[in-house]
Amino acid sequence: MRIYLIGCMPEGKNSDLEERIMKILLAAVNAKYIHSNLAVYSLKAYAEDPAVEIGEYTINQQKDDILMDIYKRQPDILCLSCYIWNLDYIEEIVLEIGKLRPDMPIWLGGPEVSYDAKEVLRRLPCVKGVMKGEGEKTFKEICRIYRNEFEKRENVCGYQDKNVDNSWKKSESVDNQL
């Protein structure tokens, strides 16, 4: 399945329509370079979307190198997998990438953020939302929301985010049985 976003070029450039695939980056910050984050691979496989990319980093890398790599990839949406060994590190990266790309939605998931999503969203104002639970179905549906393929956002389960007016929206959990 290939999904295209159609948009008009800025006036004066080219009035023809341009097709562009929305890029979604699933980023994992591992404890060591020999470790691999299976969650991001599971999310990508379930989403069945060629526009989803995976970026794997380690807590031993310089934050600036990770920020540079994320910036060079130019994702439209950034999703990060949070665990006890990388949460502080990811929070620092998120705050910096939020300054570099304030228009880019940033989503977090994983056991270290899903139990108290409201506090995470309060602490990290540049984060759009937190995915809860297993995540596969929720991630796929959030991708569809951003592509305007999902008619009723209220039907998506397993996340908490901030509405446009910064009020809280909490969806019910979802059974993500594969």
Where are these regions (language model features)?
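A short, charged helix-loop
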Residues: 172-178
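Glycine-rich beta-alpha loop elements in corrinoid/cobalamin-binding modules
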Residues: 5-10, 39, 43-46, 50-172
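Short N-terminal binding/cap micro-motifs at the start of the first secondary-structure element
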Residues: 33-39
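A structure-centric signal for secondary-structure junctions around beta-strands
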Residues: 21-23, 37, 153
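Nucleotide-activated donor-dependent transferases that construct or modify glycoconjugates
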Residues: 23-32
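Short, Lys/Arg-enriched N-terminal segments with co-localized hydrophobic residues
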Residues: 3-21
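Short acidic-aromatic active-site loops that bind/stabilize oxyanions
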Residues: 32-33, 83
